Amino acid sequence: MASAQVVTFHADVAPIIFNECTSCHREGQIGPMPFTNYAEVAAYGEFIEYVTAIGYMPPWSPDAEYAHFVGEKVLTVEEVETLSAWVDGGKLEGNPEDNPGLPDFPDGSQIGTPDHVLAMPEPYVHGGDMTDQYQVFVLPTAFDGDVSIRALEVLPGNHAVAHHAILGLDVSGTAAQMDDADPDPGYEGFGGFGFNALSSFFGAWVPGALPVNYPPGIGRTIPAGADVLVQMHYGPSALEASDLTEVNVFLSDVPVEREVYTAIMGPQHLGAPFVLPPDEVTSFHGTMPVTEDVSLLNIAPHCHLIGSSWLVYATSPDNQDTIPLISVPEWDFNWQGYFTFPFLKKIPQGYTLHGEATYDNTASNPANPNDPPDWVGFGEGTTDEMFFVFIDLVLFEEGDESVALGPPGPCPADLTGDLVVGVSDVLLLLGDFGCLSACSIDLDGDDAVTVSDVLFLLGQYGTPCE
């Protein structure tokens, strides 16, 4: 940025804050303070400068230089420099006419009218004792037969304490029994659902994220009589807070020809027993063969409080080709997510999936639940650990690399699905530049990534996609 440029809130800072921060930092949401106008942002200007400079905010755990995902919240170097220059320049307000205005934050569904709404049977009251709580709620579906769905959408009843949610499926009735045995609504579940559910990762929600909305012909099946499980993470609160979360069910508009399956890499894929000695940093490397051509939709590495990093990728049989999937250099259990690729990502038959996780079981790990550090094994408790990589996939078909998984809208150049055409989209396009056939990105429809695609994107650069 040119040093002579005068940086103001309305012209330069508001577009950054409103697009990347305000979805959480507004009244009734999980952010501890609102960022909806000049006065609110200016009051925390120095704090914003610091947490963005060190990459602590916005909270996005995957390394955006390793792989891109739909809806990623990552500031560019230029945006961070703009925030810093604004603070250093005295936090000038500027001309209100330059302000782009707040984005539209819908109260209800973000993707349409649901076919069914599943609701918690009664409100859950989260205690005002400044602790995190993980509670599993059992939502009966009561479907007469199997149903094919294109989307599940979590609508938290209280955004001020709802931190994230993970969805599962149960057909055994076990979750309902655990619910009945707990005097509170639902039952406590820290690391998972407390038993071997039919699906332990059927979907997820984090603040500001759009639900996964499968392309036509792709979907999932909810079996007849199944219960949808919702593991809610409630963040610390100084006051009691009531929540009544709902799950919107969207049935497939066309017959589902390609069922989404979840591949799970777990401890059985490790070459060593899953044991974490005290006062040591331990790494594990899991591998899983790819026996058919597949296309990946989502990925979610999962461990607990001692976990410190993840790296997931695929390699060719001759180790000459590596497909990056996700890197989480600083794992934070409280900000785990369910990450959707911008386009279906092909992994050819014969490749090998790799999952590398590091665990810091030392006293220097502030998240370590044991003081002093102790031996830790596999389990669902707070003091236990896990090694899982959940990957949603379908069998590969020609043209999959061009099937977009981001939200539909007026901006085909919004490759990362973050609702604005910006630097991250340029970088994603340049990563495929020079492709001449079967390209994962093709904006002008000529089955290649050339200068015309770059010009197409630049023509939409800076466009908000709402």
Residue locations for each model-derived region?
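Short secondary-structure junction motifs
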Residues: 30-33, 162, 307, 438-440
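Aromatic- and Gly/Pro-enriched helix-to-coil junctions and flexible linker segments
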Residues: 2-139, 225-231, 460
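Glycine-rich, acidic and aromatic/proline-enriched surface loops and short helix-turn segments
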Residues: 50-54, 305, 317, 432
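Acidic glycine-/aspartate-rich tracts in secreted/extracellular proteins
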Residues: 27-30, 360, 434-435, 462-463
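Beta-strand-centric surfaces of beta-sandwich/beta-rich domains
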Residues: 62-69, 98-295, 300-408
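Cellulosome-associated attachment modules in secreted, modular CAZymes
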Residues: 5, 67, 407-466
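Short clusters of hydrophobic/aromatic residues that line enzyme substrate/ligand-binding pockets
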Residues: 35, 57, 202-205, 413-415, ...
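Residue-level detector of buried hydrophobic side-chain packing
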Residues: 13, 83, 152, 228, ...
